[in-house]
Amino acid sequence: MVSTSSYQTTKSKEIFTAAQKLMPGGVSSPVRAFKSVGGQPIVFESVKGAYIRDVDGNEYIDYVGTWGPAICGHAHPEVIAALHDALDKGTSFGAPCVQENILAEMVIDAVPSIEMVRFVNSGTEACMSVLRLMRAFTGRDKIIKFEGCYHGHADMFLVKAGSGVATLGLPDSPGVPKTTTNNTLTAPYNDLEAVKALFVENPDSIAGVILEPVVGNAGFIVPDAGFLEGLRELTKEYGALLMFDEVMTGFRIAYGGAQEKFGITPDLTTLGKVIGGGLPVGAYGGRADIMAMVAPAGPMYQAGTLSGNPLAMTAGIKTLELLQRPGTYQYLDKVTKSLTEGLLKVARDAGHSVSGGYISAMFGMFFTGSPVHNYEDAKKADVAKFGRFHRGMLERGVYLAPSQFEAGFTSLAHTEADIERTLAAAKEVLASL
């Protein structure tokens, strides 16, 4: 464990101070600025396995995993070797490559809902594109999303969003016209009756329902029994589409994602993070008859200069090959169980009211004793206490997501020894809060 007396981040502070004159807020994505946990962010120098090293030489056990992609651990040697081989052939083609076919076949084989897939460059791009597709296929304009669920920063989704929007305490974003979000209906997550009411009020105008099947962008929140099943039934009843945003859960909570885990098959799915092995990537796919609407096969236009990038495809292929190996998800479940149950126990033993849980390689803990079923429940958590907890863990060599409203991630590189060190640090920090 790192000695708190020797912990310093002088170089990180200098770099971040300079960055604030060069980039808005000093970062390329808001949550990285540590606004919800106080202090200034650490600047990374390198990552390897379950560890990150900052520019001041401090080493941390990492439970952010570059926000989800690093399920095999950072800089996995087999992924790096595959990338070296691909790099010699060029960084970008802007044309078809065989790696697209290989990764597409792997995704289609793995994800129950996907019969055809289109690769893009980010989760935001995937969700933005699939929303257009839902509207094109149904001829309807309205969508239902859930409070606290985050589907990227496209205008139509910035209504009661989670992730960085929740971190900053913003209900939406300036610059988004009301006309853009007029067709975005919202309901509390896990509230099937609220969804039913929206369908009753708009029986012929809802194109579909979009959600994180397991919420990771308002903290870690699981679906109540019957919730996903109820959504599937409602969308079928009203002729609407069901879309799972599995950018975070895809290949993480099961090889086939949340839809495999819960046995509910949506019409469409978005993916990202894991399928790029740490490189920028996104994808959307679903039923062949719906995907046939996408250009150039159909009239719904969507394109991208770097889509299907050979390096991203290569990293994704090797990552999925690693995940196919026997015992992968059993191991992820084991280490995440030890971590999550251990954190909850040491927190409660120290007199703190907490709740939380995990599924495979995804977990979360809220500083509230009440069960968290939706975004409103999540907002009752003690954000200030989480900020102090985060800082204490950082000083002891443990890097957690810098927001109460983000899920945590484990990887195949995490060991039981890493978990023990983490719990020892947590015990020390929680005793002092």
Curated annotation (Swiss-Prot):
Record-listed N6-(pyridoxal phosphate)lysine modification sites: K273
Gene3D superfamilies found in the cross-reference section: Aspartate Aminotransferase, domain 1 (3.90.1150.10), Type I PLP-dependent aspartate aminotransferase-like (Major domain) (3.40.640.10)
A GO BP entry: chlorophyll biosynthetic process
Keywords: Chlorophyll biosynthesis, Cytoplasm, Isomerase, Porphyrin biosynthesis, Pyridoxal phosphate
Pathway entry: Porphyrin-containing compound metabolism; protoporphyrin-IX biosynthesis; 5-aminolevulinate from L-glutamyl-tRNA(Glu): step 2/2; Porphyrin-containing compound metabolism; chlorophyll biosynthesis
Cofactor(s) the protein needs: pyridoxal 5'-phosphate
Compartments, as annotated in UniProt: Cytoplasm
Annotated signal sequence range: none
Main location: cytoplasm
EC number: 5.4.3.8
Catalytic activity: (S)-4-amino-5-oxopentanoate = 5-aminolevulinate
GO cellular component annotations of the record: cytoplasm
InterPro entries (UniProt xref): 4pyrrol_synth_GluAld_NH2Trfase, Aminotrans_3, Aminotrans_3_PPA_site, PyrdxlP-dep_Trfase, PyrdxlP-dep_Trfase_major, PyrdxlP-dep_Trfase_small
A molecular function GO annotation: glutamate-1-semialdehyde 2,1-aminomutase activity
Keyword match Transferase: no
SUPFAM superfamilies linked to this entry: PLP-dependent transferases (SSF53383)
Subunit details: Homodimer.
Family membership noted in the UniProt record: Belongs to the class-III pyridoxal-phosphate-dependent aminotransferase family. HemL subfamily.
Protein name: Glutamate-1-semialdehyde 2,1-aminomutase
Species of provenance: Microcystis aeruginosa (strain NIES-843 / IAM M-2473)
Gene: hemL
